[in-house]
Structure formats: C-alpha cells, structure tokens
UniProtKB/Swiss-Prot annotation:
It comes from Arabidopsis thaliana. Accessory protein regulating the assembly of the plastidial Clp protease system. CLPT1 first binds to the heptameric P-ring containing the CLP3-6 subunits followed by CLPT2, and only then does the P-ring combine with the R-ring composed of the clpP1 and CLPR1-4 subunits. Once the core complex is fully assembled, it then associates to the CLPC chaperone partner to form the functional protease. CLPT2 and CLPT1 are partially redundant. The gene is CLPT2. It holds the Pfam family Clp_N. GO terms for molecular function: protein histidine kinase binding. Disulfide bonds: none annotated. This is ATP-dependent Clp protease ATP-binding subunit CLPT2, chloroplastic.
C-alpha cells in the first residue's frame, strides 16, 4: 500500500514528472553549441557576464594559450649623420650598456612627461643603467640620479600632469648631436671596440648649451674630469664595466 501511494505521488508531482521527462530526452546538439555572446539576466544578480556561459573545450584552450611576443633587438642608436657610417662592415657597434642607457633615458623622459629625450635624459639613463664604469665614475664624483632629476626640473620645469609622452620621445637636436659625437669619437679611434656610455657622456659634455652639460656643470663636473674619463675610454681594452 505504501509503495503504491509513493508511486502515485511521483506520478502526480509536476516537478518530479518534469525532471523524469527531461532525463529521458537526448540532446541532439553538443552542449558547447549553446555558448552565446549575449549577456545573461538574473532576477537576483542582474546582468551576468557572458564569460560564465558554456564554451567549447577547444576554444577554451585556445583562449588560455599564451600569446607569442616577437621582440626585435636594437643593433644601433639613431644618427642624424649617416655619412659617418660608410658601410655595414664599418658600422660601429653600440655596447649593450650604451643601448640600455639610451632606453632608460627614453623611459625617464616619459616618466617626467617630457615630449622629447634630451641630453638630461641621456645623462639620467647612464645613471639608471648603473653598472658601467661611467655611471660609477659619476657617482664617485657625487653626481647622483636624484640630484640630476632635481636639477632637470629646476632647469626645464615640471611638465603638464595631463600630458602623455609618446612611447619613444624623439631626440632633441643637442641629444642627437651628443650621440653623433659619441659615434664620431669611436670612428676617430679607428672604429675599434664598441661605442659605450663613456662616449655618450663625453658627447653630452661637448654640447655646451645643452641641459645635460649645464646640469653636469652645476653638480661639479669639469673639463678636467671630462679629460680624465676620456683618458680611461681611450685605453686599449676599455669595456666601460
């Protein structure tokens, strides 16, 4: 009697009947086909992001697969005087420290929200790189990064806080001449060895009216110290490390 009544209850209960009828049906379409880009609505949660909808296992793997990032190596720094380089065979090589110093200078110009990479930024780049003999030479003479930053803001002023620098702030004319001077120093020495941060610093110092030269002079850098650094850089086997 009890078994008979429970059977009647199952047949008369609409919820159980619906569940039972649904379980007997077979889906003719794969479950992941029902993935949709539309937002789902829920009376309690409001709009539910479509990312919660079911997706194909294959597409999920493709989505989670890390993207390949192609990196290009920088082989040289910009020059405004291509006549300095006659052919690829004679093209001087920039050391990795010089290239990193240049990249750090660009980044510092962006941090300060300046529209260009000037000699002051190249100077800060040498100090930020930090491992070269030139950067150690500057610090030994009490020319520190924070001091150069302070003098830069005093000399050039603060940039507009709402201004966004380009990804690669273009070089100012004096910064370009400083890099060309660094390149020229290497060529005058016979093009032997690499162009190093020491050559960049000497190029900055050669631009007397540039912000970088003025900041160096304010912090105690002199022609005597420039000649001292030049004597080190001209030695055979000097690697600026």
């Amino acid at each position: 009697m009890a078994a008979h009544s429970s059977c009647n209850f199952a047949l008369t209960n609409p919820i159980i009947s619906q569940i039972d009828s649904f379980s007997k049906k077979k889906l003719s379409v794969p479950l992941y086909f029902f993935s949709t880009r539309k937002a789902l609505t829920n009376p309690w949660l409001g709009v539910v992001d479509s990312s919660l909808s079911l997706t194909s296992p294959v597409s999920a793997l493709q989505t989670n697969r890390p993207r390949r990032i192609h990196k290009s190596a920088i082989s040289s720094l910009p020059t405004a005087n291509p006549d300095l380089v006659v052919s690829d065979a004679k093209k001087p090589k920039w050391s990795w420290r010089a290239i990193k110093s240049f990249a750090m200078g660009e980044l510092e110009a962006r941090k300060l929200k300046y529209p260009n990479t000037g000699t002051e930024a190249l100077l800060m780049g040498i100090l930020i790189e930090g491992t070269s003999f030139t950067s150690k030479f500057l610090r030994a003479n009490k020319i520190m990064l924070y001091k150069v930053r302070e003098e830069t803001v005093k000399l050039l002023g603060k940039a507009d806080m709402y201004f966004f620098s380009p990804e690669h702030p273009p070089l100012t004319e004096d910064a370009q001449r400083a890099l060309d001077s660094a390149l020229d120093q290497n060529l005058k020495a016979g093009g032997i060895g690499e162009v190093m941060p020491a050559h960049i610093l000497l190029g900055i110092w050669s631009e007397v009216e540039s912000p970088g030269h003025k900041i160096l002079a304010t912090l105690g850098f002199t022609d005597e110290k420039s000649k001292e650094l030049e004597s080190f850089a001209s030695e055979s086997g000097f690697l600026d490390e």
